[in-house]
């Protein structure tokens, strides 16, 4: 089972992603967080394989949180999740240690494929 921690400042989106993850074989949502403080607290007791992290997390910077996560001992993989298309984001995300960037409008199967690849250590094709 791939253990996913969902981090987004919108409660409805968090709940929706948690529900969708419950329906997909091979995935389990081990927790959710609405901000960076909740993320770091949840990280320690959920031990996810991958964190699905909103790029624009309220006033917080998802890239900075990604760097913080990657500095943890035994860090989880990170997939940035965004509603905003930004041509420079892929490079910034990779530099911050994220596995990939997925648009919130992407097909759910593409999201699942990206999460699987992240855990296996593969890179998403550009």
Specify the residue positions occupied by each region the protein language model found.
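The feature encodes the CheY-like receiver
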Residues: 58, 86
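Acidic catalytic/metal-coordinating carboxylates
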Residues: 35, 61-64
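Active-site residues of response regulator receiver
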Residues: 54-55, 82
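Acidic, metal-coordinating helix/loop segments flanking the phosphotransfer/catalytic sites
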Residues: 32-50
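Short amphipathic alpha-helix used as the core "switch/output" element in two-component signaling
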Residues: 63-74
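C-terminal output helix
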Residues: 88, 106-119, 123
